[in-house]
Amino acid sequence: MPTAFSLSRISTNVRFSASALLFPDLATAVAERMFLTPPRTRDAAASALDLVDARSSFLEHKGRHIAMWRWGSRESPAVVLAHGWGGYAAQMRAFVFPLVQAGYRVIAYDQPAHGVSEGRLTGLPDFADVLAEVAGIHGGVAAVIAHSLGGAAAALALANGKASFKKVVLVSPPSDLVGYSRRFARWYWMPEAVRKGMQAAIEERYGVRWENLEVPRVAPRLSAQALVIHDRDDRLMPWTHGATVARHWPGAKLMSTEGLGHRRILSDERVTRAAAEFITAR
C-alpha cells in the first residue's frame, strides 16, 4: 500500500470514489485487481543479481514460473526464506550466511507476481501454496523464516496440512487482514460497500473466507515452535500485530526491537542471529 499522497494519487482516488457511486460492480472488480496486484519495482528484478552465489532454478505453479535460489549442501536440513507482499528474495539475504555456517541448506524464492517470478495477480492463498510447493520440491525442510505476509502464508500452509515445519520464525507478521483491507479502502477513498464486494470476490476466487486466513485464528492448533520478531516502530505493520500472533500461537516467543521499522529489520544482525540461534537450538 502506498505511504504518501500525491496530486496524481488524489486524482485517481477522486475518480475511483466517483465510479464507485455510479458503477459499483465495476468498482468492485477494479478494487479486487488493485488489492491482488503487488507493487513490482525495477529494484526487485535487479535484486536477483544479489543472489548470483546461489544455485538458481524454477518451479511451475498454476502456469507461472517461480524463481528459486539455494545455498548449502543438498544433504543438509533446509530452511526456507519467504518474503512478504511487495518484497523479493534478496531482501532475506542477511539470514543466509548464519544458517549456512550452522550447517543448513537455505532456499529463497520470489513469490508469485514478485521479483523475477511470473504473474500479475496473487494473494495469501497463493503464497501459502507456493511455500508448500517450494518446501516439497526441495525436501528436508526443518524451518521457515518468513516476513510480513509470508508469515501468514507459513501459518496457513501449516494449518492446511500442506507443509510441515518444526520451527517457524515470523518477522513482522500480520494479524488482521480485514483491518488491512479497511486501511486499503480508506487510502483509495473506497466506500465500505465496495470493500465488502472486493472481499467477497476474493473469497470466491480462492474458495476460502477471510477469517480462516487470519493467523490468530489458525495459530492455536499449530504445533510448530514459533519465534515472532517485530519492531515497535513498524508503521506498515504495527507491533501489536506481532504481539497478537505470539499470544495466540502456543508457546511462541516474542522478540521486540526498536528503530528498525518494517524492512530494515530484515538486515539487522541481532535479528538474523536470533533467528539462526532459535532454529539451531535443540
Show the residue positions of the predicted features.
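Conserved alpha/beta-hydrolase "acid-adjacent" motif
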Residues: 235-241
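Catalytic histidine-centered segment of alpha/beta-hydrolase-like enzymes
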Residues: 260-272
